[in-house]
Amino acid sequence: MPVVSMKELLEAGVHFGHSKSRWNPKMAPYIYGVRHGIHIIDLNKTIVMLEDAYHFVSDVIAQGGEILFVGTKKQAKDIIKEEAERCGAFYVNERWVGGLLTNFQTVRKSIMKLQTLERMEEDGIFDVLPKKEVRNLRRKMEKLRKLYNGIRDMKKLPDVIWIVDTVREKIAVSEARKLGIPIVAIADSNCDPTVIDYTIPGNDDAIKSIKLLTSKIADAVLEGKQRRESAEEVVPTKERRPVEITERERQLFEQAVEMSEKYAELDKDSTEYE
């Protein structure tokens, strides 16, 4: 049974891309067509490619790997935190600090500095320091928490990275590629899928779409951990039988596209999606 159903994808609006004028031609293989000036993403391909991504993530985790969730735009940040915490993954949902991966040891020093400040507060050292100095230390501590709280226990580089909006998170993409860390990501119609190792064609702006796809990756992490604990033999993703799209699901998708008149006024480039 597929990881996700056509009905789930349609209800979450995963098929809505950006306006035609904003597309990246490299996404052409994943575009079904255009409706009212908006690219429609081919969900038949989304189902198959999400399946591959899901099993890849599960395999990595089952073999003892770790994953980092990344998404800093406002409609993604809360979802990234919630789903990462649900599956026990590391996450970045505020601002990507340049060098977070490529200069990881320096980042670790900043995290150690945060831990030192927290110990000072717990041990009552702040109580005997001048108020002005304490204010400055607390301000510094909060800034470090905001930046690094989701990775404070990450002792080494992640083995895979999940990204929502590779255009916005281009620095994270660049660093991961430089280090050879596999990228699993949503590819909206304005993205370059060639920088992604496991592409999931879909809407990376709508909250429901982000939630659905991120939750599936979190589910893959949980499954991988369960397999690791049960010492299940890992079957490489490439050896799995590919998922097949049923005729019923194909028809459901085509009907939904044809009925998209009611979305004629939808403008993904409006402030609703900023």
UniProtKB/Swiss-Prot annotation:
Keyword Ribonucleoprotein among UniProt keywords: yes
Any Gene Ontology biological process: translation
Highest rank taxon of the organism: Bacteria
InterPro entries named in the record: Ribosomal_uS2 (IPR001865), Ribosomal_uS2_bac/mit/plastid (IPR005706), Ribosomal_uS2_CS (IPR018130), Ribosomal_uS2_flav_dom_sf (IPR023591)
UniProt entry keywords in alphabetical sequence: Ribonucleoprotein, Ribosomal protein
Record's GO cellular component terms: cytosolic small ribosomal subunit
Pfam families tied to this protein: Ribosomal_S2
SUPFAM superfamilies: Ribosomal protein S2 (SSF52313)
PROSITE patterns on file: RIBOSOMAL_S2_1
GO molecular function, a single term: structural constituent of ribosome
Family according to the record: Belongs to the universal ribosomal protein uS2 family.
Annotated PANTHER family: 30S RIBOSOMAL PROTEIN S2 PROKARYOTIC AND ORGANELLAR (PTHR12534), SMALL RIBOSOMAL SUBUNIT PROTEIN US2M (PTHR12534:SF0)
Protein name: Small ribosomal subunit protein uS2
